[in-house]
């Protein structure tokens, strides 16, 4: 028969209690560390989301100042993306993950949009001889709508693309003379008229501020200048608004 002395039982019990207390102490410390990590994580996520939101607001402000609707453009950037998948109940962790993902996705979309908007002037040094809107025609003296702005500089001054895109038209056109048209995506196009020389062909890709031609006096003009247009969804926009809005992003003239 196996016997255990009473004092040995007490010793064994005290040992187990001590081990249990040690384990509880370690568990408590681990819990404190976990709580601290969770707070640090929450703080980091909060700071990150605030920074992302501020950057998005800055870009939205620039787009709005150009006369465009940032929400409309963001929707265009997403397109008709197919959707589906299994239903997974939402948790706090998953909610945070989705919030971060959505904020980042929107910021990325806004950045791509701003890169595609013509926010600079097509030449470095110029003066404006005709603004956008109603004006007296310089040739026949009758009032009509001017769908762009006229930028005066010396003949053969370099003309640059005001945003990256693809050349959709080149050559001679009535009233424009020698012209270049660029599609920047999102429904945005720019036109450059009265050129002396065209350096690009239809279908070519162009980068931001890449030379596309030289200033001239071709077409219906009274002297050398660039007729510059911005279109959104085929409707003429005021190019000056885009250039002024771009001063928040670029060091414009």
Residue map of PLM features:
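Non-catalytic extracellular/periplasmic "stalk"
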Residues: 1-127, 131
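Catalytic cores of peptidoglycan-degrading enzymes
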Residues: 115-253
């Amino acid at each position: 028969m196996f016997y255990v002395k009473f004092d040995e039982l007490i010793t064994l019990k005290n040992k187990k209690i001590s081990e249990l207390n040690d384990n509880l102490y370690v568990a408590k410390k681990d819990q404190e560390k976990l709580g601290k990590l969770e707070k640090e994580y929450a703080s980091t996520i909060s700071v990150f989301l605030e920074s992302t939101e501020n950057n998005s607001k800055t870009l939205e402000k620039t787009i709005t100042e150009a006369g465009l609707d940032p929400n409309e453009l963001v929707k265009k950037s997403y397109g008709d993306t197919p959707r589906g998948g299994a239903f997974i109940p939402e948790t706090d962790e998953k909610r945070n993950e989705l919030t971060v993902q959505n904020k980042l996705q929107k910021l990325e979309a806004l950045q791509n949009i701003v890169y595609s908007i013509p926010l600079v002037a097509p030449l470095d040094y110029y003066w404006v001889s005709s603004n956008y809107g109603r004006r007296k025609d310089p040739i026949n003296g009758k009032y009509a709508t001017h769908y762009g702005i006229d930028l005066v500089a010396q003949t053969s001054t370099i003309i640059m693309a005001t945003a990256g895109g693809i050349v959709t038209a080149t050559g001679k056109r009535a009233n424009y003379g020698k012209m270049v048209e660029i599609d920047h995506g999102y429904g945005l196009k720019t036109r450059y008229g009265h050129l002396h020389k065209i350096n690009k062909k239809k279908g070519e890709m162009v980068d931001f501020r890449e030379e596309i031609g030289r200033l001239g006096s071709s077409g219906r003009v009274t002297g050398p200048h660039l007729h510059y247009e911005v279109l959104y969804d085929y409707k003429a926009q005021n190019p000056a608004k885009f250039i002024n809005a771009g001063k928040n992003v670029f060091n414009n003239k």
